[in-house]
C-alpha cells in the first residue's frame, strides 16, 4: 500500500476541503523522519504539533502515517497530545460530520492528563512508584492510549484519502517504492537540521511504518475484485480487464481489444488465430452492403423436451440468445465475395459451443437447397463441438439430412462447395459436411477431430500425442487440401471460384 506523509496529505486540496479545522490551514514545514527508539512511552509523551498558520504556537508533528482497517476507527473521539514544552492540546475527530479540530482546552486537558499521564514525570526522571503493579498499570494504560490515538489517526487518513488507491498502489509497486525512497531521503536531510526533536517520535514513526508495511503485504496476498496480487499471472489480469484486453491462447500475450477486430483476431505477439464470432467472419469474407441473411427467425422448440437439473434447455437457449444476439449457432445467407455472389453459412462457437441441433441442421439444409436452385458456389465456415445432446437423435439426423442435400448439390448439379475448418471442428460436423467439400480449407493451428482428446483418453486409457489433432499434422496425412491464414483467405476463395468459372457479376 502506498505510504503517505502527513504534510503531503495536508497540502492536498481534497483533504483541505474534507476537513474543517478550528485553526487556519497555513503552510506546514517539513516533517522529519526519525530513527527507531527503544522507549515508546517516553517518546510518545513529547509529541510535537506544528502550527497550522504562521501565528499559531503549535509544534511539529513528526508522524509517519500508514494505513489500517477503517473498522477499528471510532466515528466521534477526542484525544490528548502534549508537545515538548509541556503544553497540552486536544484533538477532536468527527468522521461522520468531517470535522478535525485542535483546541487548547486546559481544563479538559488537565483532567485527561491527570488520568493518563499522572506518572509521566516520574517515568522521565527514572523514579518508580512504591507499588510495582501500579507502575505496570500506568505503563500499559499509556501504551494503550497512544496506540489508540495512532490507530484512529491512521484509519481516518485512510478513509479520507487512501481508500481509492488500492488498484493503483497494487499495480505501481515499483513507482511507490521510488516515491517512498525519495520521501525518505528528503526527510533525512531535514532531520539533520532538527536532530533535537527526533527522539520524541521514534516509536510512533517506526510503529506505524511497520503497520503500513504489514497492511501492504496483506493486500498483495488477498485476492479480491479490486486488488491484484503481485504474483498474479496474465490470466488473472485478463479476467479483471477483459473489457480492454484479449489474451492469446498460445503465448498468453495481451492484445488491445479495440484494435483486435481490425487485426482479424490474430495475436500481435505470435500470430496465433484466435476464435472469431460469426458476425466478424461475415464481415471479413463478404463485401460491405451485400449481406442478405436467411431464416433469421428460426428457433428450437425443444423437440425431445429435454430437462436438466441445473437449467432447462429452453432457458439455456434464451440465455445464449441474449448474450450473443443470435437466434442459433449458425448464420446463413447470401452475399458477394469480391463481386462473386455466394451462399454462405457461418457457425458460431459462442452459441452453445456451436453445437448442431435441429435448427442448425435445417438452416444449413435450406442454404444448400437455395444454392442448388440459384447455381451459387457454397461456403460453410465450421466451428462446432458436434451434435447437440439436448436434442438427442434429432440432432444426429441432421448429419444425414445435410449430407443428402450436399450430394444433390455436388453430384447432380456439379456445383462447387468449400468448407472452412476453424478451431474447433469436432464431432458430428467433422463426420458430415465438414469433410465433404470439393476443396477443404483449414485455418492454421485449428483443432480438428471427431472425438476430443479427453474422450479418447478416457475411453482407451491411452495418451493422445500432443499436436496429433492439429491442422498442420492432419494436413500431412491428407485430410484436407489447404491451410490458409485469414489475411489472404478472401483472395484465395476468389481465385478458386474463378477457377471453377464463377466470376464477378460486373465482369464482362
Swiss-Prot record:
Pathway: Lipid metabolism; malonyl-CoA biosynthesis; malonyl-CoA from acetyl-CoA: step 1/1. InterPro entries: AcCoA_carboxyl_beta, Acetyl_CoA_COase_Trfase_b_su, ClpP/crotonase-like_dom_sf, COA_CT_N. Residues 173-219 have a biased composition (Low complexity). It is found in: Plastid, Chloroplast stroma. Residues 35-47 have a biased composition (Basic and acidic residues). It is an enzyme of class 2 (transferase). One of its GO terms (molecular function) is carboxyl- or carbamoyltransferase activity. Residues 220-234 have a biased composition (Polar residues). Binds 1 zinc ion per subunit. The keyword Membrane does not apply. Zn(2+) binds at residues 248, 251, 267, 270. SUPFAM superfamilies: ClpP/crotonase. It comes from the Eukaryota. Component of the acetyl coenzyme A carboxylase (ACC) complex. Biotin carboxylase (BC) catalyzes the carboxylation of biotin on its carrier protein (BCCP) and then the CO(2) group is transferred by the transcarboxylase to acetyl-CoA to form malonyl-CoA. This is Acetyl-coenzyme A carboxylase carboxyl transferase subunit beta, chloroplastic. The lineage of its organism: Eukaryota, Viridiplantae, Streptophyta, Embryophyta, Tracheophyta. The gene is accD.
